[in-house]
Amino acid sequence: MSALELTARLAAWLVASGFVLLLAYVAFRPLRSGRPALDGVIYLLLAVFLTSLFTLLAGLFGLLRPALLAAIAAAGLAVLLAAPGSRGVLRQIPQELKSGLSVCRHLWLELPRWLRLLTAVGIGLSAARFAFLIWALPPFVWDSLTYHLTNVAHWTQAGRIELFETPVDRIYSPANYELLAAWFTVFLHHDVVVEAAGLPAYLMGIASVYCIGRSLGTSRSAAWVGALAYASTPAWLIAATGTKNDPHVAGYFLAALALAIDLSARRSSGRAANSLGGILSTALALLLAAGTKAYIAHLLPGLILIAALHQPGWSSLQLWRNHLSDAVRQLRQETVRARTGLGLLLCGGLLLGSYWNIRNWILTGNPFYPYEVTVEGAPIFRTGDRTARLELDRLFGNLENLASKFGDKQDPIRPDLPNTTGWGWVVYGIGLPAALWGLIRRRRLRVLSAGFLVSLLGVMLSNRPSPWNMRYVIWFPALFCLALAILWDEWPAGMRLARRGLAVLFVLALGLNFVMTLNYNKISADEFRSMLELPALRRDAAVFEDNMPRSYANAVEFVPNDALLGYNVHNNGFIYPLYRSDYSQNIVFVPFSAEDTCEAIAERMKERGTRYLLVAPEHTHNSNLARLRECSRQETVIRERAQGLYVTR
């Protein structure tokens, strides 16, 4: 890629991003809560929401090209600047920025000096860590290489969102995360920064924990301690750049929880509430999550429980009835233009929340394809090679798994969380004792704990027990971090020495959490060195040796970019690395079985338009591997060009 082309692509990305961010600000104005931190969560949520919606609409119409996206964005910017209503809103941005900086400065000065120093060092080191890992390493997490980023690669290549032939049927799964990831690839036509797609959810989760802490009555500094604790949680920190969708579900869930708790707390404190904005923002967060991963439905009972019981007695139910009536009244008082805009926001949310399931229902008869759905053995939706069950056996199996993983002593904490919870030093060292103390002292923490537990049980009722099941509950450590925030405020003022000891323990635990995630707890120095020796734009996932069979690197080495590369893997095999980091390699699935003759396999390759066929141990069925080796040994029409790479003569 020439410097001129790179500049043009970056300019297109800047124009498109500017349009989305300004549009998000216009949409944000009627949704404001009046709490600066929560307003930050709402704005970030809207930015992610509108980016995903823009990508989906452009992709469905075949417009996922930098120039086309920039042209649409430029036209949108012209409309925003020309329309009197939006132009007036945009003029307020400088004043809003000034006000926001003033709030940040006030919070900063309110923090103790040691906490300011810790924050500055933590933000600096975290930013450096994120930047280095995103720049140095290609994607390497298993599910991303099978289907998450495979969708992204195909959409980027094709310029449109569509289904394509592949043995990995999980490409049918809800793909709102992939929409956001595509925003980080389509302009550069490269995956060099695709890992950064997880950072908005990471920031949203941290800010939401801070907001929940404030709604629970903690001071700003205590809420910030809780937010820092969650930011350092290894499972959350590692997942942020792991190119998977679970951090996004966690971020949206915590944002919805922060919004719901804020509405629950408003009337009791005498503060005015933007009921319409709070309810709509909560709905958008949950709809965005629904189009990301279906298990958000299993988290809802816990969220509802917290919202319903946040106030004692029956006052919460009356409070929510008042919020609903206020929201209707506010909507009626809005101008026609404002009502239209809010209606379009809700329609966009419904589209993002339901598109993937409706598409699957139309095409396969099952909205949750490729998963069959059964409840205690009774089938609800039959079509699919995988099964999503709601069964007590799964619940008990997952609880046994959690008990065995508790303490994170079995294995290192890694991106897929094999045999660990990933909760880390802060949770087990300080957060867990703080939670036990808080359950005795604070009613609202008991309600919060009950809701978190209900959501945890909901996920474990349906999730298949496995070594990796804790990645679905990376939001759960936030409970212990909030308990720590409450303890921080209620620590007796006279026990200064003990308080300093607690601060030292907190800093030490944060440092240990950070250190263990520097290399994802698995990437060796040699693996870093092998990547850094390559130019930044040539760090293909196929040549990263962490978990990659040799045949993928052979494909990069021996197959020309302009050739069509055939592949044969099973339904959990790597596909994404075959596209290369710049998405220059066109690929095609070549189905065959061990019963096919060598000539039949070669004919199948010819029908697909390719001379090349890649297979790999652990990714291709053993019987197919054996068949190709036999064809090569017998000197038939197929020969092995390099390990795992076959060509027709």
Give the positions of each predicted feature.
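Transmembrane alpha-helix segments characteristic
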Residues: 45-49, 121-127, 224-230, 284, ...
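Membrane-embedded, hydrophobic transmembrane alpha-helices
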Residues: 1-107, 118, 463, 601-605, ...
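Transmembrane-helix signature of polytopic, membrane-embedded enzymes
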Residues: 33-42, 192-193, 209-234, 251, ...
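Hydrophobic/aromatic-rich transmembrane helices and adjacent perimembrane loops
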Residues: 148, 153, 246-249, 289-299, ...
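Signature aromatic-anchored transmembrane alpha helix within multi-pass, membrane-resident enzymes
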Residues: 113-123, 275-285, 300-307, 326-329, ...
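Hydrophobic, aromatic-rich transmembrane alpha-helices
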Residues: 26, 209-210, 316, 404-446, ...
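Extracytoplasmic
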Residues: 556-606, 625-633
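Membrane-proximal, lumen/periplasm-facing interface regions of secretory-pathway glyco-
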Residues: 139-143, 148-150, 506-557, 571-575
